[in-house]
Amino acid sequence: DEWKERGNVWDYEAVFHDHNLEGQRPLLDSINTFAEIIQNNGYKTAFIGKWGLGAPDTEGVPNNQGFHYFFGYNCQRQAHTLYPTHLWENEKKIILNNKLIPPHSNLEIGSNPNNSNSYINFSLNEYAPELMHRKAVEFIESNTDNSFFLLYASPLPHVPLQAPIKWVNYYRKKLGSEQPYTGKSYFPSQSPRATYAAMISTLDEQVGDLVALLSEKNILDNTLIIFTSDNGPTYTGGVDGNFFNSAKPFKAEYGWAKGFLHEGGIRVPMIASWENHIKKGSVSDHLSGFQDVFLTVLELAGIHHPVETDGISFVNTLMGLEQKEKHKYLYWEIPEYGGQQAVRMGAFKAIRKNIFKNNLSIELFDLATDIQETINVADQYPKIIEKAERIMKKEHRKSVLSRFRFPAFGE
């Protein structure tokens, strides 16, 4: 939630001069976060990257939510440029050597999109992902003798399309000439495919650096690394998901990828690495969600957490053992793009769309035979639809914010 009651939160110049317009509505202090639990059990904790759970000077800043150290964006909107005017270190605003180019700016009128000089304004001096990476390295180096937890929420490869020139040139040679993206949203790019690939390679290189550092410090076999994403690929800002098969075997276009509850939007890779503990190259089809990381990590750390959560530990799956405890179902709900609910029950996936348009009908897909969710089999399985309906009703919570409430539900 952008917390628009504060003023024009989309005026980037105003936000730069008044941090009270920055950030999102804060996570309540009464919420006991995973970071607070692990911090209270002797771990050094850090959040590096993009934070959107509490604006500056609120109870929601990372330092108030269980993190000893924070470096990065404290605002989702500010992360719409990878060359920001500032970042935050703990609760201190760090001014960078970048002039303000408001996110979503386009090429100047009359500019030639095929001339590299037209894009000079969009490649500045201090690249946020590089600054964050250095801080991640510093945190690990300063805690090699401590138990530590690092949540590294890299802004890569989120648009806008901005990447180190060495990688952009590498992919320009591989991909050849291409149609420029002239910036209908986010920023323009002369070589959008090459730049997107460059962003991925930058992230890959940074992850490799961290793994090498853990090995160099002789703590790799005592460190669990989990690499995953918060959503499927985007289709905006010049990103060509279909060209890269970004969601394969799912669909990567609007209506099916990021922001939507089809598989292309919510099913993401999850890679876990723990030297000498997790079998290399092993693969699991265990049905899981990010809420399960909570209890999994606590179990591995030997931390007892008595409060009931939605997650289950998947330690046995990581270790190649039988996963006795499994989800009966997974549930998703988002107010964006018309309002959506989804339930995954075994091979079946139920989706309700356009709730704000008073739609209450539910589509049903058999993922075992229709992974792209193209054949609605709701009429064939009325009892499964009834079950999905009960789950949606049980799991839904009326939003505290009126604009997120569904009138179709009598709210």
Predicted features along the sequence, with ranges:
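Formylglycine-dependent sulfatase
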Residues: 1-363, 371-398, 402-411
